[in-house]
């Protein structure tokens, strides 16, 4: 795990509230016990039609080349649901170094910190200003 000093990056906006860990990384992909390889299945059910990698869903932010970066900006209550550490692994393995939101589920926030992913909490007002950019 490397220390984060400064991140120079564009942000990727995910304007969905109450994103739970099963949406971040679906349970059917949790067979591995090492943290490598989970990024390809990040938001899998939102990214692909019929679970087919050759058929990306139009309009989903991770499928849009205009939105690339190492900072994920998510709506409030990000990482709710179960306590799976795999959610932080998948976000990190995809290439995100930080997640910005107005509220994180406590277990997700701790898992992120313990695994080198930086959760940044901002006010809801500030978060909405980011989304408007």
Please state what every model-predicted region is.
Residues 105-121:
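Active-site-proximal loop->helix
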Residues 1-37:
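N-terminal, positively charged, Ser/Thr/Ala/Gly-biased leader segments
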Residues 95-108:
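A short glycine-rich beta-strand->turn/loop micro-motif centered on a GG-aromatic cluster
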Residues 65-96:
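Glycine/serine-rich anion-binding loops at beta->alpha junctions
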């Amino acid at each position: 795990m490397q220390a984060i000093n400064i991140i120079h990056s564009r942000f990727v906006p995910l304007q969905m509230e109450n994103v739970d860990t099963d949406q971040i990384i679906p349970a059917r992909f949790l067979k591995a016990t090492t943290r490598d390889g989970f990024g390809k299945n990040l938001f899998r059910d939102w990214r692909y039609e019929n679970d087919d990698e050759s058929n990306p869903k139009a309009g989903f932010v991770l499928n849009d080349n205009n939105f690339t970066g190492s900072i994920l900006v998510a709506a409030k209550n990000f990482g709710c649901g179960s306590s799976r550490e795999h959610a932080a692994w998948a976000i990190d393995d995809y290439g995100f170094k930080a997640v910005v939101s107005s509220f994180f589920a406590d277990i997700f926030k701790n898992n992120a910190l313990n695994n080198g992913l930086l959760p940044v909490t901002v006010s809801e007002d500030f978060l909405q200003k980011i989304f408007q950019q």
